[in-house]
Amino acid sequence: MAKKIMVIDDDPIIVKYLVTLFSDNGYETCSASDGVQALEAVKTARPDLITLDLEMPQEWGPRFYRKLSKDAELKKIPVIVISGLAGQHAVKDAVAFIRKPFDLDKLLGIVKKTIG
C-alpha cells in the first residue's frame, strides 16, 4: 500500500505541483488549503507525512501544528515545513524546514528518508 502525504498550503499552484510530484513518485496524496480544514482532514485521512506552509488564511501553520501536537496519535505524523517565511523556529519539531522556492530533489529525498 502506498504511503500517504498530505499537502497543506493555501496556494493552489503549490498544492497541484506537490500533489503531482508525490503522485508521480508512487505516493497517495490529499490536501487542505488552511489550518482549520487541515486538522479535520488529517483526522480523517491519517497521512504518513504532512507538508505544511506557515502562512495561510484562517489559521496559520504554527497554530495548526500546536493543535496537531496535542493529539497523542496525530503528533506522531512527521511534518516537513515548506514556506517562504524564515520562521523555522515556529515549528521546532518538524522533520525539515524547506524555504520556498525549493529544490524538488531535496524535498523528495527528505520524504523518502522519512517515510520510504
Where are these regions (language model features)?
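Acidic catalytic/metal-coordinating carboxylates
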Residues: 34-37, 60-64
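Receiver (REC) domain active-site loop signature in two-component systems and cognate sites
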Residues: 56
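Conserved sequence signature across two-component system core domains
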Residues: 8-9, 32, 50
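C-terminal output helix
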Residues: 102-115
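Active-site beta3 strand of CheY-like receiver
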Residues: 45-51
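Two-component/phosphorelay signaling modules centered on CheY-like receiver
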Residues: 12-30
